[in-house]
Regions:
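Active-site neighborhood of HAD-like aspartate-dependent phosphohydrolases
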Residues: 1-51
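Asp-based, Mg2+/Mn2+-dependent phosphohydrolase catalytic module
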Residues: 1-5, 128, 132-232
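Generic enzyme active-site microenvironment
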Residues: 9-11, 123, 183-184
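An amphipathic alpha-helix signature
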Residues: 27-35, 39, 62-67, 128, ...
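Alpha-helical elements of Rossmann-like donor-binding domains used by nucleotide-donor carbohydrate transfer enzymes
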Residues: 29-36, 68, 109, 113, ...
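A metal-dependent, Asp-based hydrolase signature
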Residues: 40-46, 54-95
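Short, acidic loop-to-helix structural element flanking the phosphoryl-transfer center
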Residues: 90-122, 128-132, 164
């Protein structure tokens, strides 16, 4: 399919990196990292409690959700967040190094194909150090012109999607117009970020239930990353 795009922006986790790991539950490595952070303060929570008390507020409220969690347990939010980030970054890098986190099937081939037609960029809600490591570890750096993850300080949670902060930064750095860009993401919140940036989008997977939460329809739908060649 012929397109007029000049840059394809790729989300990382769930798009070309399978971050679920090898545990019995998805992202078990991340739960274990969080439990390690809690253990430092003498706190023990189940996975269900972590989901309810921390992850759900983190996703919906960002930094305010983290502060509310810390208030619940009498923790200093800046100190706790710094420890949490350190532990989860170390765990994610180790999971990639040891083979627990791998590329999604077909990712390298389609990334190589796309890099021959477009500029490629990464815009991820994962930490910058994890994005750097993933591209280096999986030998993907040569294919990408630019890549962004978020900073690890608490206030940087505000730059996560649906905020188009890093999409806009890529367009600025490459001196491209909005009509020149398309974002590929596996989450509807990413599609909303693309809408907020005024660019086209591709949604990987058909999670209708999650899509209902967000006001944004993708330009294209594909089942997996290998199908990108059909629309780009």
């Amino acid at each position: 399919m012929e397109t007029t795009y000049q840059v394809v922006l790729l989300d990382m986790d769930g798009t070309f990196l399978d971050s679920r790991g090898k545990g019995e539950i998805p992202t078990e490595w991340a739960y274990e990292a969080f439990k390690k952070s809690l253990k430092h303060y003498g706190i023990t929570l189940t996975i269900g409690e972590i989901n309810n008390f921390f992850l759900a507020p983190l996703r919906s409220e960002g930094a305010e959700g983290v502060r509310n969690f810390c208030d619940r347990f009498g923790l200093d939010s800046e100190e706790f967040w710094a420890r949490r980030e350190k532990d989860v970054i170390e765990a994610k890098i180790e999971a990639m190094r040891s083979g627990g986190i791998k590329l999604c099937e077909g990712s390298e081939e389609i990334i190589k194909y796309l890099s021959e037609k477009f500029y490629l960029a990464v815009v991820s809600d994962s930490q910058q150090v994890c994005v750097d490591y993933a591209l280096e570890h999986f030998n993907l750096k040569p294919y990408f012109t630019i890549w962004y993850g978020r900073k690890s300080d608490l206030k940087s949670l505000a730059t996560r999607k649906p905020n188009p902060f890093y999409i806009n930064r890529v367009l600025h750095e490459l001196n491209l117009r909005r009509v020149d860009a398309i974002l590929v993401d596996d989450r509807p919140v990413g599609i909303l970020a693309a809408k907020n940036a005024g660019i086209d989008s591709v949604l990987i997977g058909h999670n209708t239930k999650e899509r209902a939460k967000y006001d944004g329809e993708p330009t294209f739908l594909v089942k997996n990353i290998s199908e990108l060649g059909r629309v780009l």
